[in-house]
């Protein structure tokens, strides 16, 4: 039987793991917004004829942002089909709130939050496995 200290340490580790994966999943929307900002800046400068290719406002990050978005999408797609996978897709890829995603999936808000937390727990193991395979 595990002691109280060991149980607390395991719980803290799981919480940290879930926070890491949550930050990783949230990066999808940030990268999408950065790409959108990049397109807007490019369009604005081309239209005003002040565009200089050497002085891009956000130079060099596009490849990274696209790769990061692809990583997030592939992590979610690697999950088994089910409510958890759909919840993560609607919330992190499509940018819907948890409440609206639950509505779209046909269950209550409370169930939506439960499914979301279960999904984060499940995907955190996939994320950690991928991270360890890269090292």
Regions found by a protein language model. Give the residues of each.
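Short amphipathic alpha helix immediately N-terminal
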Residues: 79-96
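Secondary-structure boundary/capping signal
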Residues: 83-84, 109, 131
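Helix-turn-helix DNA-binding module
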Residues: 94-110
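N-terminal interaction/assembly modules
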Residues: 1-78, 99-100, 124-135
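Short, conserved sequence motifs enriched in acidic/basic residues, glycine, and aromatics
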Residues: 78-79, 106
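DNA-recognition helix of helix-turn-helix
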Residues: 106-126
């Amino acid at each position: 039987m595990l002691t109280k200290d060991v149980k607390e340490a395991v719980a803290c580790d799981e919480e940290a793991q879930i926070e890491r994966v949550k930050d990783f999943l949230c990066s999808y929307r940030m990268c999408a917004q950065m790409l959108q900002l990049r397109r807007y800046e490019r369009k604005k400068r081309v239209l005003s004829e002040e565009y200089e290719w050497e002085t891009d406002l956000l130079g060099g990050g596009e490849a990274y942002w696209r790769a990061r978005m692809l990583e997030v999408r592939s992590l979610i797609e690697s999950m088994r089909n089910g409510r958890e996978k759909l919840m993560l897709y609607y919330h992190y890829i499509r940018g819907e709130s948890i409440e609206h995603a639950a509505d779209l999936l046909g269950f209550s808000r409370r169930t939506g939050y439960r499914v979301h937390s279960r999904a984060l727990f499940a995907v955190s193991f996939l994320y950690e496995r991928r991270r360890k395979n890269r090292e």
